[in-house]
Amino acid sequence: ATDDNGHLYIGDIGNNSNTRRDLMIYIIEEPFPTQTVVTNTKKRISYYYPDQKEIPAKKFNFDAEAMFWKDGKIYVLTKHRADTYTQIYRLDAFNSGEKRPARLIARFNTRGQVSGADVSPDRRKLVVLTYTSIWLFETRKKSDNYFKGKISWLPYKAEHCEAICFDGKELIIVNERGDLFQLKVEDLISIRE
């Protein structure tokens, strides 16, 4: 994820077995690819899910691969293994070295495991990638709960797609092999206005 001030957010947020106690997001200055050899971590954000009552959790619902930045806050979308839901959590405070609770915002059945997400430049749209479909959520107001607004969707067939981002009126998707796919936002099917 990136913010408006040239920072790159790197998530060490994977938790396949739901046993991790050290979920971390690193903030660095976004390096210039041809000139930067080494970069320093500006901040480390340690967090936990308050609704994960035991480690490991009996339901494997605390893994994550997707996150985005919006208006000074970091959002993480979970990748459930016990069901096909995702949950959006928000991290409000970025005090380095202090473990902070992630605040649960909303829950939605994506009918698959979430592998990527991005927020549009105007912050009104959230695109969510699963292994079998693309979801587009649009808020009606300045809300954190994208799942209550307009929803569009599109199934796809490509192997192990792991990342998605907005590029104007298009979406760019990449899989584990490095293949890039391009899709017009208008091609998604509206399922709720």
Predicted segments — roles?
Residues 1-193:
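Sequence/structural signature of beta-propeller domains
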